[in-house]
Amino acid sequence: MQLKLRWITILIVFVVSLFFMFPLDKRINLGLDLKGGMHVILGVETEKAVQAKIDTLTGQIRKELRNSKINFAFVQKNESGKISIGLSDPAERNKVKDLISKNYPILKESGLNSDEKVIELSLDTDEVKRIKDYAVEQAVQVIRNRVDQFGVNEPVIQRQGKEHILVQLAGITDPERAVKLIGKTAQLKFYLLDENANNEETIKSGNIPPDDIILYGKKIDKVTGQIVSTIPYVLKKDAVLTGDYLLEAEVRISSQFNEPYVSIKFDPAGSKIFEEITAENVNKRMAIVLDDNVYSAPVIRERIAGGEAQISGSFTLEEAKDLAIVLRAGSLPAPVKILENRTIGPSLGQDSIKKGIWAGIIGVAAVIIFMLIYYKFSGFIASIALLSNAIIILGAMGMFKATLTLPGIAGLILTMGMAIDANVLIFERIREELRLGRTPMNALEAGFEKAMSTIIDSNITTLIAGLVLFQFGTGPVKGFAVTLTIGILSSIFTAVTLSKTIFLTLYGNKEIKKLSV
């Protein structure tokens, strides 16, 4: 009965393994080094996230001082990246400080300015750290959302260190497009034009009002797709609406010009803001700005309800699709720069697969030949366990959707050797028992029983190392850890359960005088 239960267990393991193993090309995900693709390390410019927060706070403070009827000369970010508040009346200094202390606890007075009419504020050190850390975490999530919409299987997107992000996309066919998609900041903002300052004379003189900024649009030749010229726009410094309220973004084709554009829709809160802005600024121009580039600056003809707008700019269909993807996925909290960009061609990956397979075949064949010569029929049983081990490992990888890498193949070959090592321990123990004068059947039982603790101890030690590598390793190291961990568990099963079951089936009910070991 116990032997029957053993065979049922083995059969279940093999059926499940074969089910998840085939077809190999669909069940086993290949890593970057085998399938080809791109490996990119991005650096998040976290300091710009801090400066963006200061810009936002500057606008909020300016608005709050106006609402509180406090007269001020200016509220602006100075050259050192701090917020400077210029007071019209020094007597209101304490009133302003109380307002800041109450509503903006993350801001601290620098105390370096001796002018009674100027209050200089900087972000708290802990807040700066929080902003930088959040910027990287959010960037990882945004990039992951973009890649998911791009349709890449098993992408690797993870944080490295304080400000770096690792991106590995296996099987990518257009790495240049993928890099653009990943690296685009996609900060969507809406600004009102300063109609009084938006003229050639003001722009040429550079005498821009302190509450304004100049951004540029691009005039593109529709035939060649080349930039013909840039168009300056003088905009009110504070954005009236941002992409944070964006709900949908999809590509549509203009019936008038037969060109693709991106239709966007805001959530209820954004729709309300958009409606209020358009109602208050009829016959004025509003610029649609993406990553500091003005895409269009249409005149608001009437109140716009429903929260819908469109971004047009002589896009190709692919450009419009990519823009819709990055807008849906959200904007990066800070720009990213490419620190490392490597592309691995599919032919190089195929070459690695062939070499890895041949290395495995030669290694396994050499081991089987040695086992047959040295351990005779017992070596044949060990060889069956060895090949079974490979099936179980590949089946487990298919079940857990693990990714096979070149180091993973090395881990697979290593565990095959470890599986044989377990059988060698058992066989040597059986030989030792036979030399002590035990009967073949007693020597067989004693060999498996006494070798068990050594096999378990050695494999548990390696298993712990594999789990540590899996937890803290990245890329190739993690791929090696996956096959190593699965292989260790599989080798214990095949050596202890499968090999012993075969021996018991062949010799369990027989009087044997000699073991071929």
From Swiss-Prot:
Keywords: Cell inner membrane, Cell membrane, Membrane, Protein transport, Translocation, Transmembrane, Transmembrane helix, Transport
Superkingdom classification of source: Bacteria
Transmembrane annotation, as ranges: 5-25, 357-377, 380-400, 407-427, 455-475, 479-499
Localization annotation: Cell inner membrane
GO MF term set: protein-transporting ATPase activity
Principal subcellular localization: membrane
Cellular component per GO, a single term: plasma membrane
InterPro entries listed in its UniProt record: Acrflvin-R, SecD, SecD/SecF_arch_bac, SecD_1st, SecD_SecF_C, SecD_SecF_C_bact, SecDF_P1_head
Pfam family, one: SecD_1st
Coiled coil: none
Keyword Protein transport: yes
Single GO BP term: protein transport by the Sec complex
Its membrane topology: Multi-pass membrane protein
Subunit note: Forms a complex with SecF. Part of the essential Sec protein translocation apparatus which comprises SecA, SecYEG and auxiliary proteins SecDF. Other proteins may also be involved.
Role of this protein: Part of the Sec protein translocase complex. Interacts with the SecYEG preprotein conducting channel. SecDF uses the proton motive force (PMF) to complete protein translocation after the ATP-dependent function of SecA.
Protein name, UniProt field: Protein translocase subunit SecD
Encoding gene per record: secD
